[in-house]
């Protein structure tokens, strides 16, 4: 399918979109079709009944994904220490630890709204999964993987405790769009590719706030995107999940726009020490009192814990209420 696309925000050079083979298709059958119809009805109900000025994501399995006990909080609740226990939150949650979550944590009907796509741009072909409304989305969430990852990681329904399945459902059921792309690197080329990808979908959903979630080394792209003036104007929030700090953010367009920032970090992260990320979080508040920043420390959690344990709905609804 060929389409010349307007790119009013960024010179992304997008010229076309083509569809690839969709991974992990759900089983067919009458029951699956009926469940899908109910899913579509639920999406339309949310889309047409929720007032835009009060838009927030409707619940999805909140009782399973809400944070466990809060051990400590300060900064008016913007800094929290969450009780994380490996035996409970991995072994007690997964059917096969770290490989397959128990079935009650997921709903694979959302796969009916999932496509494996690519766009051709001046930055190259960008492969990505898109879940939900590719036009007129109410909200867009983009997940950028870390070192060694790929676009498949962000749509795997069963790893990381089913948390990727939850964000897919939260977007799809609320008239939103979820994107999980491939990209070449964590430097300038990768940033150009993600800018082109987001420009493509932003042109089709001009009212949608765009949330960028960056896992581990993917944070390098979060910080690069924050430095882009035109891009920063569309960012609804940045999520740093087991990632690192960048002092240049304090002088970025996104910072001056007071774009909400969420940090999720394990206290036993051996890749990026939690103390340095906490210090950066506090530096934001010191430079700009009242800045919309949150930090969730998962006590005893490790490098990958925030991807498993971050409460997507709680975080994104907070950002929706605080975005510029």
Name each model feature, range by range:
Residues 49-51:
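N-terminal signal peptide c-region/cleavage motif recognized by signal peptidases
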Residues 122-166, 170:
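Short, surface-exposed "cap/lid" segments of acyl-processing enzymes
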Residues 290-324:
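C-terminal catalytic histidine-bearing segment of alpha/beta-hydrolase fold enzymes
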Residues 262-265, 269:
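Short beta-strand/loop motif that positions the catalytic acidic residue
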Residues 184-205:
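Alpha/beta-hydrolase active-site loop
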Residues 209-257:
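Primarily recognizes the serine-hydrolase "nucleophile elbow" in alpha/beta-hydrolase
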Residues 273-283:
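Short alpha-helix in the alpha/beta-hydrolase fold that links the catalytic acid
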